[in-house]
């Protein structure tokens, strides 16, 4: 039998101590905001039929390079969920949620996702993604509300971000654009990376535009842009949206190279990127509109808009002040309970349960019966207070409570403590 230590799989994380506190604090705040914006939570399975992703994201890196696939005992091709939207819309259609609820349908999720990619700061193979989907007969005010919600999340965690925005047009406009891009980039095939060459003759050609290396090349910067192909009506629509952002006081940057990494986007796409940060993974929230995915999975001519964020990436870019605030916010006292009197073990155990029933965080450590050792244990285990039960406490129905931060203590009647 091998003695080699088994460790976590590369690209995954064990959550504990302060990291777990941060994860919970961020999650709780975002969920609370979701409630304020009247979104309802939805959970979908961790794995789906692989076709759900291969059919709707066939040209994306997610399917080509990053999808975790498996074949089960019944020879079915399955895949670990790489993103949330396709699964959500599959569930919406399967359970007829659009028929049973008023429009727009407003859903959010917070789930683990899986992508086989090189682990780096803010990007893991297993990561927790929060996202929203707004589905129905949408208009520009729905788009604006979605952007405002995303901005509200970022403001809550004191992130200074720049909104990057682009308009990809409808399916017909985008198809013409993709055809022109393919013709254009074939002229420079010898100057493209192997990955970019593999993206030619498909919708994947769009990814050349926002590739971190290719986008620095002059001929890529001079490539045809979508505004040369969208209709006058769409140009007017986008212009109105930008004017409305101005009226709302939302600063933005028009980025004609912004395409996002998923095939189903059309019309509006956007990203909130950390200001004054040139790191590759500095996008904190990304999203956009989509219609073809809705039509493909529900057979309804509707629109949807959504965005997503990674909890891990949020944590990696939080400033120290915000981290400390999140870790210490609403932190309740944690009590270590010890008994110094023989034959009072069951009575102490019963006392611990009574305190827990009154919503106190209490642990009775029955193996400690000396105060100095109990203090050392409590400090190591991050308890804030020590409850000492000696002969006087038992006879007078009191508790001696020691504050471990100030090293002060008081003796108080049990009934007064639980009021």
From Swiss-Prot:
Family named by the database record: Belongs to the class-II aminoacyl-tRNA synthetase family.
Pfam families: HGTP_anticodon, tRNA-synt_His
Database matches in Gene3D superfamilies: Anticodon-binding domain, Bira Bifunctional Protein, Domain 2
Gene Ontology BP terms: histidyl-tRNA aminoacylation
Quaternary structure note: Homodimer.
NCBIfam families: hisS
Primary subcellular site in the record, as a coarse category: cytoplasm
PROSITE patterns from the UniProt entry: AA_TRNA_LIGASE_II
A Gene Ontology molecular function term of the record: histidine-tRNA ligase activity
Catalysed transformations (reactions): tRNA(His) + L-histidine + ATP = L-histidyl-tRNA(His) + AMP + diphosphate + H(+)
EC number: 6.1.1.21
One term under GO cellular component: cytoplasm
Name this polypeptide is given: Histidine--tRNA ligase
Subcellular localization: Cytoplasm
Keywords, in A-Z order: Aminoacyl-tRNA synthetase, ATP-binding, Cytoplasm, Ligase, Nucleotide-binding, Protein biosynthesis
InterPro entries: aa-tRNA-synth_II (IPR006195), aa-tRNA-synth_II/BPL/LPL (IPR045864), Anticodon-bd (IPR004154), Anticodon-bd_dom_sf (IPR036621), His-tRNA-ligase (IPR015807), HisRS-like_core (IPR041715), HisRS/HisZ (IPR004516)
Top-level taxon of origin: Bacteria
């Amino acid at each position: 039998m091998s003695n080699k230590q088994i460790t976590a799989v590369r690209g995954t994380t064990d959550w504990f101590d302060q990291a777990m506190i941060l994860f919970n604090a961020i999650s709780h705040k975002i969920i609370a905001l979701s409630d304020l914006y009247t979104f309802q939570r939805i959970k979908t399975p961790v794995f789906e039929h692989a076709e759900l992703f291969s059919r709707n994201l066939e040209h994306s890196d997610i399917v080509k390079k990053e999808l975790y696939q498996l074949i089960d005992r019944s020879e079915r091709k399955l895949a670990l969920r790489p993103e949330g939207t396709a699964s959500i819309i599959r569930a919406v259609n399967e359970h007829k949620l659009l028929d049973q609820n008023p429009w727009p349908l407003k859903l959010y999720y917070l789930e683990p996702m899986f992508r086989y990619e090189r682990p780096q700061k803010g990007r893991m193979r297993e990561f927790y993604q929060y996202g929203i989907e707004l589905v129905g007969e949408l208009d520009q005010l729905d788009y604006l509300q979605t952007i405002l919600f995303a901005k509200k999340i970022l403001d809550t965690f004191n992130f200074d971000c720049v909104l990057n925005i682009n308009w990809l047009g409808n399916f017909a406009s985008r198809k013409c654009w993709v055809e022109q891009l393919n013709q254009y980039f074939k002229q420079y095939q010898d100057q493209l990376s192997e990955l970019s060459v593999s993206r030619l003759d498909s919708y994947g050609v769009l990814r050349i535009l926002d590739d971190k290396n290719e986008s620095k090349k002059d001929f890529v910067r001079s490539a045809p842009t979508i505004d040369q192909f969208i209709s006058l009506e769409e140009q007017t629509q986008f212009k109105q949206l930008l004017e409305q952002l101005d009226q709302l006081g939302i600063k933005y940057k028009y980025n004609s190279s912004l395409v996002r990494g998923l095939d189903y986007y059309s019309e509006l796409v956007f990203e909130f990127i950390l200001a004054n940060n040139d790191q590759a993974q500095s996008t904190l929230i990304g999203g956009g509109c989509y219609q073809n995915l809705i039509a493909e999975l529900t057979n309804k001519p509707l629109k949807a808009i959504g965005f997503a964020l990674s909890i891990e990436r949020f944590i990696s870019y939080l400033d120290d002040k915000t981290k400390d605030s999140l870790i210490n916010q609403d932190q309740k006292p944690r009590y270590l309970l010890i008994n110094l009197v023989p034959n009072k073990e069951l009575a102490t155990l019963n006392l611990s349960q009574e305190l827990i029933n009154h919503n106190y965080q209490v642990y009775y450590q029955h193996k400690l019966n000396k105060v100095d050792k109990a203090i050392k244990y409590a400090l190591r285990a991050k308890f804030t207070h020590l409850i000492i039960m000696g002969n006087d406490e038992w006879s007078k129905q009191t508790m001696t409570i020691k504050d471990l931060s100030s090293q002060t203590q008081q003796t108080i009647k049990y009934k007064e403590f639980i009021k």
